[in-house]
Regions:
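Hot-dog-fold acyl-thioester-processing enzymes
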Residues: 1-84, 150-151
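HotDog/MaoC-like acyl-thioester-processing domains
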Residues: 2-13, 91-100, 104-151
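Short amphipathic alpha-helical patches
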Residues: 52-59, 71, 90-98, 129
Length: 151
């Protein structure tokens, strides 16, 4: 595998990267929810049919975890120091068994750190999309990134 090293200076505003995919199945939804979010809509197919969703849906935290898994396929890991936070988190549509999810990352802002000269702060608009192109999750992700050595 070729290793790509991406640092703060390499981030070009307006660039969009699309990575995926992740197929969600019933066992995935139920096993995650049994441990972390045991609501009937996530763990009981019969009870879920009686809800406004009409069937099983993935937990919001599960959806965010899938986003995180897909984000690790964007070659920025060598440059990442830490997460700075998530803003404007929105769940637009439910994630259901059989959905195939993709992550779209668009770099929307960057600035040098005011207090640490070896790093910068990058903001990305994250969109998790299903197989129909529908956005199921969106948010802004603030990422603290290393500058290349010697800068």
């Amino acid at each position: 595998m070729i290793r790509v090293h991406v640092f703060y200076e390499d981030i070009e505003l307006g660039t969009t990267v699309r990575v995926g995919s992740y197929r969600v199945d019933t066992d995935d939804i139920v096993s995650y929810a049994r441990r972390w979010d045991p609501l009937p809509v996530h763990i009981d197919e019969q009870a879920a049919k009686q809800t406004m969703f009409g069937g099983l849906t993935a937990s919001g935290s599960h959806t965010l975890a899938i986003r995180t898994l897909l984000l690790h396929r964007v070659p920025i890991q060598d440059g990442v120091i830490a997460a700075g936070g998530w803003d404007e988190v929105r769940f637009h549509k439910p994630v259901r068994p059989g959905d195939e999810l993709w992550l779209e990352v668009t770099w929307v802002a960057k600035r040098p750190s005011a207090s640490k000269p070896d790093r910068g702060v990058v903001t990305a608009l994250m969109k998790l999309l299903n197989q129909d192109g529908d956005v199921v999750l969106s948010h802004r992700d603030v990422i603290i990134m290393r500058l290349r050595k010697g800068n």
